[in-house]
């Protein structure tokens, strides 16, 4: 019997959680509990409209006064007042005839903005200024209610004394603010409060002599709700944001953060929008880190971030992306919205460009800040000038001409590394041919590069050739076709077969004399080249290396193809691609076998996307090394997404030790094992009030978790609380290769809801983006 009772109780709970009413939209539920304006909205100045009075009885004293009793109703435009008794008088004043209405014994007032119930009211009918005693009020078509000892209604504001305000629905007193004086600004949509006390279920929590709160969707300056919690890394922490609405196009957020193990950190963000662009400037500053590992280091820890994008004078574009931190471990020690330790580096880029229909020119500078401890970092390009020219139908022929040219100066902080100027021109002519059966593109290209190299400043710096010329011609023939058939295993569906064949030729030239031989994981080859990751789409690239300092020889065929399946409405539901490169000669950049391709063919590369139905999607890619006869790289993602942010995602990625070693440069630290990681992400709105996000990434090779996160949110019409617990791999200085450290943290965030018209949305999206391995949408078919 006891077991059956538990069963019935469980069924009752589940029925409540998943009932139709509980799954209704939270915003609709909340707004259903507030009054709505149902009449026809009358525009214009209400003071110019006539006044209508109805009552059971009326006594008139000629043109001096009038008394109305019994179901009195006074209406002017959208304004309506109901009472049992009303007295109206008029007097001559220097500025004209003044009419006054006095209501006693209780009344109800409403317009398209507010509803009132009070004991006594006095209304100046000329100006409609209204003074009320002992009233309850409720905003119309939005949340917000309260009471006041006296209320003065004016055209632009409401002034209340000994007032109470809350956005909670009637019969819910979860939170409220009591103030000695409160002024609600109607047009600006904010409330000022003096001598305010914030209460939770009637219990005072804190007092402030002055407070501002938004009562609409307009941005307002003031304190935002805090975040607080605890972690192994920071200890107890508390951060209090303050928002400053400087102007319609300028605002700032300043957030002091206290960490019991580290001290005070000041964070700030400034946003701007101007006729010539928009941007964001941010900073984070900790004067001295009190953590044991940094206590004896007399230096600050800080971050500076600036992004700017603008278009001006019609043809000009300016872009700036700059992030710099005080030390390599900054993003390992601090959570920041402006970077992550998993990025590996911070960008510092500037670019200004001028565009015309057939050409463009750009001047830029870029450098990178590496987060790992390295003796030799990457080069910076300062300055860099790019010029591009395009001309289709050259001389009224079917030929297209394109020119890419670049001049760049490379510099390195290490005195061991050479400096260089690189001058590059890359003209190409292609002949595109196409018909309904397919397309053929024949392209010829010339790589012409000149280097002027200078030996490093250090005495032990290696010698380099001062002047180098490299000229490499290239020929590429690309053939594609599309074959379609409606004879598929699903009636009404269409399947295509799209073969793709490419031949590429480029002669060999030894390029080991370009740049330094002191390569490492971040320097790559030469000045800005590194081996590109290979996948199916990379099979048809012209080059194996990024940048221009390593252009590998090529004498190869690439053979691949894609099949697609379309449903009855013409929407793509499935695709599968497979391909491989066949080398007629080894692809080389120098005489080192380590930098050459092996065998007569590349790995098989496969890629696929499958929209199983409107809820289920699958994506995957795979590479099989034919030389080693084993898998080299693979990943897949399976996701169930029935509605909105309700998500269940399973992901897996694999990289063999040989693949990793082959794609890292010679001085990089070699991996001792394969990478095998399995991830599970769940985000679900259980009801309109409860939502959960859970994430677990497991390293199958190490048999240890990489990151774990559990977030739970409870929302009501007027408040919400979000609790998140995270455990993730972190690092410490001088740790050994076998050591693994975890940071454990718990964060709590509380929000007031119902102050704006559209602030009932949950924080599932925010919770999905938290952590070092955030949720990614990996699908091309939607």
Curated annotation (Swiss-Prot):
Gene Ontology biological-process entries: Gram-negative-bacterium-type cell outer membrane assembly; lipopolysaccharide transport
Keyword Signal in record: yes
Main location: membrane
One Gene Ontology term, aspect cellular component: cell outer membrane
Signal peptide: 1-24
Keywords: Cell outer membrane, Membrane, Signal
Alphabetized InterPro entries for the sequence: LipoPS_assembly_LptD (IPR020889), LptD (IPR050218), LptD_C (IPR007543), OstA-like_N (IPR005653)
SUPFAM superfamilies in alphabetical order: Porins (SSF56935)
Record's subcellular location: Cell outer membrane
A Pfam family that the UniProt record links to this protein: LptD
Keyword match Nucleus: no
Function (record text): Together with LptE, is involved in the assembly of lipopolysaccharide (LPS) at the surface of the outer membrane.
Similarity comment text for this entry: Belongs to the LptD family.
Quaternary structure and interacting proteins, as annotated: Component of the lipopolysaccharide transport and assembly complex. Interacts with LptE and LptA.
Annotated protein name in UniProt: LPS-assembly protein LptD
Species name: Pasteurella multocida (strain Pm70)
Lineage: Bacteria, Pseudomonadati, Pseudomonadota, Gammaproteobacteria, Pasteurellales
């Amino acid at each position: 019997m006891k077991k059956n009772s538990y069963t019935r109780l469980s069924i009752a709970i589940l029925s409540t959680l998943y009932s139709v009413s509980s799954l209704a939209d939270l915003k609709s539920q909340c707004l259903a509990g507030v009054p709505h304006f149902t009449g026809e909205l009358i525009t214009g100045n209400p003071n110019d409209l006539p006044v209508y009075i109805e009552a059971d009885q009326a006594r008139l004293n000629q043109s001096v006064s009038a008394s109305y009793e019994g179901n009195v109703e006074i209406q002017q435009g959208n304004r309506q007042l109901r009472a049992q008794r009303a007295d109206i008088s008029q007097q001559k004043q220097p500025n004209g005839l003044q009419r006054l209405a006095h209501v006693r014994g209780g009344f109800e007032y409403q317009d398209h903005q507010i509803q009132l119930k009070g004991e006594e009211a006095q209304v100046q009918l000329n100006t409609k200024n209204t003074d009320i005693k002992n009233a309850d009020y409720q905003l119309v078509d939005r949340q917000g209610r309260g009471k006041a000892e006296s209320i003065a209604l004016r055209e632009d504001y409401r002034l209340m004394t000994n007032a109470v305000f809350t956005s909670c629905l009637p019969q819910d007193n979860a939170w409220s603010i009591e103030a000695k004086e409160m002024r609600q600004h109607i047009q600006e949509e904010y409330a000022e409060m003096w001598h305010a006390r914030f209460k939770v279920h009637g219990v005072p929590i804190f007092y402030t002599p002055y407070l501002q709160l938004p009562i609409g969707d307009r941005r307002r300056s003031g304190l935002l709700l805090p975040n607080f919690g605890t972690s192994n890394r920071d200890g107890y922490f508390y951060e209090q944001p303050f928002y400053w609405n400087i102007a319609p196009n300028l605002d700032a957020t300043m957030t002091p953060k206290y960490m019991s193990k580290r001290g005070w950190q000041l964070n700030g963000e400034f946003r701007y929008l101007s006729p010539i662009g928009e941007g964001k400037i941010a900073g984070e500053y900790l004067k001295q880190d009190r953590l044991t590992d940094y206590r004896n280091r007399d230096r600050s820890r800080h971050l500076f971030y600036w992004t700017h994008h603008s278009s001006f004078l019609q043809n000009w574009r300016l872009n700036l992306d700059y992030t710099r931190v005080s030390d390599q471990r900054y993003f390992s020690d601090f959570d920041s919205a402006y970077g992550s330790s998993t990025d590996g580096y911070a960008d510092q880029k500037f670019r200004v460009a001028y565009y015309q229909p057939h050409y463009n020119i750009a001047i830029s500078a870029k450098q990178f800040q590496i987060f790992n401890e390295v003796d030799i970092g990457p080069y910076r390009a300062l300055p860099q000038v790019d010029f591009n020219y395009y001309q289709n139908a050259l001389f009224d022929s079917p030929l297209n001409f394109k020119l890419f040219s670049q001049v760049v100066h490379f510099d390195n902080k290490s005195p061991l590394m050479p400096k260089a100027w690189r001058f590059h021109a890359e003209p190409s002519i292609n002949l595109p041919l196409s018909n309904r059966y397919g397309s053929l593109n024949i392209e010829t290209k010339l790589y012409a590069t000149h280097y002027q190299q200078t030996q490093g400043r250090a005495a032990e710096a290696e010698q380099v050739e001062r002047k180098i010329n490299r000229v490499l011609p290239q020929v590429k023939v690309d053939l594609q076709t599309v074959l379609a058939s409606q004879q598929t295993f699903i009636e009404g569906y269409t399947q295509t077969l799209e073969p793709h064949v490419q031949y590429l030729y480029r002669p060999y030239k030894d390029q080991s004399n370009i740049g330094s031989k002191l390569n490492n994981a971040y320097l790559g080859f030469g000045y800005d080249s590194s081996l590109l990751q290979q996948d199916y789409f990379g099979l048809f690239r012209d080059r194996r290396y990024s940048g221009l300092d390593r252009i590998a020889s090529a004498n190869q065929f690439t053979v691949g193809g894609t099949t697609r399946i379309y449903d009855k409405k013409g929407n793509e539901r499935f695709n599968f691609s497979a391909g491989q490169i066949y080398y007629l000669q080894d692809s080389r950049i120098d005489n080192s076998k380590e930098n050459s391709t092996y065998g007569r063919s590349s790995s098989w590369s496969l890629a696929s996307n499958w929209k199983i139905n409107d809820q289920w999607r699958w994506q995957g890619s795979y590479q099989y090394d034919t030389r080693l006869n084993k898998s080299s790289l693979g990943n897949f993602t399976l996701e169930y997404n029935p509605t909105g942010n309700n998500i269940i995602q399973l992901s897996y990625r694999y990289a063999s030790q040989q693949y990793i070693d082959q794609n890292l440069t010679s001085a990089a630290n070699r991996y001792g094992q394969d990478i095998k990681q399995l991830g599970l992400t769940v985000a679900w709105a259980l009801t309109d009030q409860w939502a959960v996000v859970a994430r677990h990434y497991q390293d199958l090779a190490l048999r240890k978790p990489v990151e774990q996160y559990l977030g739970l949110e409870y929302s009501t019409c007027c408040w919400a609380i979000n609790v998140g617990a995270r455990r993730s791999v972190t690092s410490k200085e001088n740790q050994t290769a076998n050591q693994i450290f975890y940071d454990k943290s718990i964060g709590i965030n509380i929000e007031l809801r119902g102050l704006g018209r559209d602030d009932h949305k949950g924080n599932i999206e925010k919770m999905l983006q938290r952590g070092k391995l955030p949720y990614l949408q990996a699908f091309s078919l939607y």
